[in-house]
Amino acid sequence: DVLQVQSDYSNTFNWGGKKHAVLTGVDYYDDDAKRNQNYANTTPRPTTTVGTPDNGVGVADGRAPVQWNTFQARNVGLYFQDTISLTDTLKLVAGLRYDDFKASYRNPNGSLSSDRSDSLFSPRAGLIFQPDALSSYYLSYGTSYNTSGDTYQFSPGLSNSTARSANTPAEKSRNIEIGGKFELFERRALLGVAAFYSEKYNERNTDPDTAAQQELLSGKRHAAGMEFNLAGRMTPKWEVFFNHTWIPDAKIDQSNVARNSTGTGAQVQGDRPGLTPKHSGSFWSTYAVTSSVRVGAGLTYRGKQNPEGQRSYYASGFSTVDAMVEYAFDEKTSLKLNVSNLFDRVYADALYRGFYTPGAARSVQVTLKTRF
């Protein structure tokens, strides 16, 4: 069960001879979950003779009863941000977020196996330069945390009682970004270009000396690249939506994970992190052929990548094509045909260490829409 509540307050005022735009608020998150462990049947399988299946031979169910591990977490967040107009063209952005996080884990017997409590501050700052009404440039710096008290970091396999990850402080990340936004084609379209450098430090790694009991905040990784976004009307009849992420540089800078003798296993220091393709993005475009007929097509693409935690496997890059045609009977009623994955491409959508989830096959959808 998940409960989430958020409340914001914003206002603008003049103080100290400067204009201030303030955003502040509070959010609350409560998560109550259960996780069970999978137990295989340990009873030996008897032999039987082909052609005589009904000979009384059976297999007893030797699986252990399901054991539930309970996870409970609560987080209260407070945040404040002020955008100060230093001049008519230059703005300073400064903000701070505070999180109070608590989590507990209980084993199948109901006793407390582990708990975690963190008080975290996340500052951010930036500059915005707007030389005219059609363009703006920005520089930003921000930090964030990834607490070790979450359901998927719970390690029930350790005697069903010890969550080693829960005893590890939060991971930290920081991001630096510089970019610009530009209004084009008589303000019908918006172009965004940004360069970024993201770094995760204090990354969780298994302690090689006490691997069964502890994890260390000894890892570090980074990624650097650029993002491109374009959305809007190139002409009154032609719409384009495009985004592309290019990450030429990504590396695990520090790790105590050792490369095994066969060169397989988890990524090690110097490797490119998993789930980090060099190129990914999408493109979609529509064109009004007549006042009643509109056609569209686009593609989604992603480059080659490894799953997280496995350096010897990878999924090849792929692209899928979508298409659309729409007919408007009048201003209120329209009929639209969408075809997703037009060429029925087989690809790996989600990657894991031992398997992958295939992407959706070709699908056709017809939508009749009317307004009253």
Regions inferred by a protein language model and the residue ranges of each:
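Gram-negative outer-membrane beta-barrel transporters
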Residues: 88, 192-199, 217-309, 343
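Structural signature of Gram-negative outer-membrane beta-barrels, strongest in the C-terminal barrel
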Residues: 19-23, 27-29, 69-200, 233-235, ...
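Residues that define the transmembrane beta-barrel architecture of outer-membrane proteins
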Residues: 1-3, 72-76, 117-121, 172-176, ...
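Surface-exposed loop/turn segments flanking beta-strands in extracellular/periplasmic regions
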Residues: 35-67, 114-115, 157-166, 210-217, ...
